[in-house]
Each structure stands twice: as structure tokens, then as C-alpha cells.
Amino acid sequence: EVDACGNGSRCVAKILCDEEKKEGAIIVTSNRILKAQKISENSIRLAMGEPSFEWKTIPLSKNIDHKKINLRINDLELKDGFALNVGNPHIVFFVDDCFKYNLNKIGPLIENHEMFPEKINVTFAQIKDSTNILVNVWERGAGLTKACGTAACATGVVAFEKKLSGNDTNIHFKEGLLNIKYNSVISMTGPVSDIKEIQIKL
């Protein structure tokens, strides 16, 4: 069971909207209620709720400045990581080149660091311009990923909080992008592909 999955929730919303012939749906996760809106046949917007910046709810192992987390991973010094919870825990590092970091090597070390008692999702982000951000993501429990909805949410929030962007940003993954709007509540808009129906015998 996961706390929240942005991409998975968009897919579920697409199925519900199509099957019920409605323009919206409500999805209940273990810790949030997500409101979905069908923007078009191939686009879903999710209201992801508010981010949490409290160290106990991120959670962190101790009360430190969540906006300036410094970690030493082997010989690598990582500075000013910004930790938050957007349905699940994330840490975002803004760097000059997000793809120069070998996340297969350092991702699991950050994910399982003692600072993060419930482990953490890891994003290295790079400002492309005022409305576009590139990301390289290590997903908690999954590894290197081509896309992660909550990582996009976390990145959009952190960019705004650090005054690196406005409150409307496009988050670019290795494959595809998501639009994030942040005005106390996070809104994520992204594509959904055609759904294929399969049958599995259990």
C-alpha cells in the first residue's frame, strides 16, 4: 500500500470518468482525498492537497531545517535539500545538471538515510527557464523512474518556495511532462494513455 501515487491516481480517475460517464472523480488514498477532473479525453487534472513542511509529518528523524538539509553520500556533498510531504515524503535538490548524478548509485543511499525514518523519494532538479524544470528521480521502493507524479508536485512546490519559479511550472521527465500549479493546494495536470483491458486468472 502506498500513501499517494500521482500517475496511478490519474489513470484510476480516467477509468472512473469513462465508466461512469462523468467529468470528475474522487480518489481516497491512505492519507488523502484527491479530486480529479477530466480536462480532455487524454488529460486529467488532480487536486493533490496541501504540502506538509512539518518535520514530524514529512517525516524526518529529528527537528532540523527541512529547507536546508545537507547530506554526505560517500564522497559526495549534497547541500540545501528541501524535504516535504506531498502525500508521501520527498527531498528535492536543485543542481546545475540533474542528469550528471548517478541515481542508481546514490539514490538508494539517500532513500535509506537515517534522516528519513520512512525512507524518501529523491529528486535532482534543474531550472531550464522560469516555467520549465528538468528532473531526475529516484522513487522510494521502486528505483530510478522515468516519471513520478508526486515528485513533480514536490519539485513545483520547492521551486516556488525557493523563488526559482512562479506557481505554474512544467516538470519535464525523461519521458513526458506534468504541469504543476501551486496556490497552497497543489494541482497536477497530465496525460493519460488509451486503456487496454486485460484478464488475469488468479
Question: What function would you assign to each model-found segment?
Answer:
Residues 1-4, 9-145, 157-202:
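Active-site proximal loop and beta-alpha junction motif in alpha/beta enzyme cores
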Residues 152-156:
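Active-site-adjacent alpha-helix immediately C-terminal to a catalytic or transition-state-stabilizing loop
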